[in-house]
C-alpha cells in the first residue's frame, strides 16, 4: 500500500454538531482533537510506506486510533467498531458520521510497519515535543524511574514441553509450505506424537519414560534437521525461521554424541539465554524476590514535583502534569542496573535530562553515581547496597567505613593507624593488603579479620566510585535523604494505572519489538489521560486508605510516629 500525505482538515460540520449535542461536556477523544489537534501528521510516517500501490488509510488517523485504543483498553476489533460507531471517535478523527470505518486488520498492519521502521519512539516523542511547546514539560527538575514485570503472551513450558512444542511448530510450518516433502520424511508415529499440543498432562509420569520420550523427540528433531540440510531440499524450507529456532533449542537441550542427540540434565544456556517457548523465542524467565515470570520487563521514567505552568489570563497557577518521558523494554533477565545509562542517554537525546533521578537500589552502583553526574549532570538519588562484609553484618568490628585511604600514596590506613603494604589494581577493583606480622600483633585482630595465615585485605573501587559509595552509604541514613527518596513511591501509582486500565503487565503481542511498541502506546495513553485531567482541573487522586486505616487519625487512637534516629 502507498501513502500520500494529506492535511489534517476540518471536522465535518454534521459530525461536530451531533458530537456537541451528544457530548455537551465533551470527552477525552474530543478534547484530544480540540487541544492537541495535529499531534500526528502523515509526513511523520511517510518512510513506512512505499511510493506505489493502493492508497493506505491516513497514518495520522491510525496513530490516533492506536492511542485511543490503549486509553480505553480495547482490542483491535473493539477499536475498529469504535471508529465505525462512536461519535466522539469520529470527531477526533475528522470523519463523516456515515464513514464505514476501518477493518481491524489495518491496525495490525500499521503496527507491523511501525516496528519494521523502528518508529515506536516517535509516537511518544511527538507528544512530548508538543508538551514542551505548551510549557507542560521541560528539562531539569526531578524524575523517577522504576520497572515492573511483563508476562509474555505464551504459556510457561517445562523443558520437555519446550522441545516437543518446538519440533511441533516446525512440523506445522513445513506442512503448510510443502506437505508432500514432509510426508516423505516422517512416519505415522510422528502424527501420534506431535498432532496434539505437547502438554504435561499428556506426558508420561515416570521419570524413565519421560527421559525416553525426550530422547525420542531429540532423535526426531535431529533426523528432520539432517533431512533439511540435504541438497535436494527446497531452499524455502531451509530458510524457515522455526527451523533455525529448532537448531538453537536442540543445542541447548541436547548433546550430540556419536551422531545421536542425548537429553541433557538441564538446558545449556547460551549467551542470549535459554529459549523457553518456540512461539516467543525472546521471552525469558525473570526473578525478582518471590516473583518469577516468563516474559519481559518495562522501565518507565516520569516527571515528578513538576514546576508551575504559566497560567492563562484569569486562571490560577498550577503545577504541570506528571508525564512519562521515557520507556525502555528489556528481556526479563536483564538487571535494572544495566539500563540506567541507556535511559539517561535517551533522555539526553530528547533534551529531557533531569537534575535529579530518583531510583531504587536495583538501578544503582558506585560507578553510576559518578558517571551520571559527570556525563549527564544528574544526581542519581537512591539507596546503595549495604556493605556485605561479616564485620558490617555483625554490627561490630572494622568494616570498610573504618579505614582511611591515601590515594596519592596508594595506601590504606586501618583504625589502629597501620598502613597497608601492598596495592594491587585488577580491572575496576583494588586490593590493599596489610602485613601478616602487623595484624598478628594487633589486639583488635578478632574485630578486623578471621584470616590466620595472612593480614587483612581491603577491597576498593576506583577513587571517585569509592568515595561516592561511602558518601551515599552515610547520606542514606539521614532523615533528609529518606524524605527526598520518598518521592520514588509515586511511580507505583503509574504502574497501577497502566496495569488496571491498559494491561501493562500482559504483553498483547509476541516478541520484544512489538511488546515495546505496546509499552510506548501505553505511555502515550497514560500521558493523554493525565493531560486531559489537568485540562479539566482534576488533581491527582490521593492514595487510597481503607476506612479502618483512616481510624488511625481518630483522636482516641492517634499515636505520633517515633522520631527518626540520627546517623552516627
Please place each PLM-identified region on the residue numbering.
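Basic, short loop/linker segments at the boundary and entry of helix-turn-helix/winged-helix-like folds
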Residues: 22-67, 71, 460
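Contiguous, well-ordered alpha-helical segments that form the cores/surfaces of helical PPI scaffolds
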Residues: 59-70, 85, 298-299, 342-345
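Helix-terminus loop motifs that line ligand-binding clefts
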Residues: 89-101
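A short secondary-structure junction motif
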Residues: 39-43, 86, 90, 501
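Anion-binding and metal-coordination hotspots
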Residues: 78, 83, 97-100, 108-568
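Amphipathic alpha-helical interaction surfaces
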Residues: 68-74, 85, 89, 133
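N-terminal intrinsically disordered, low-complexity, charged/polar
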Residues: 1-26
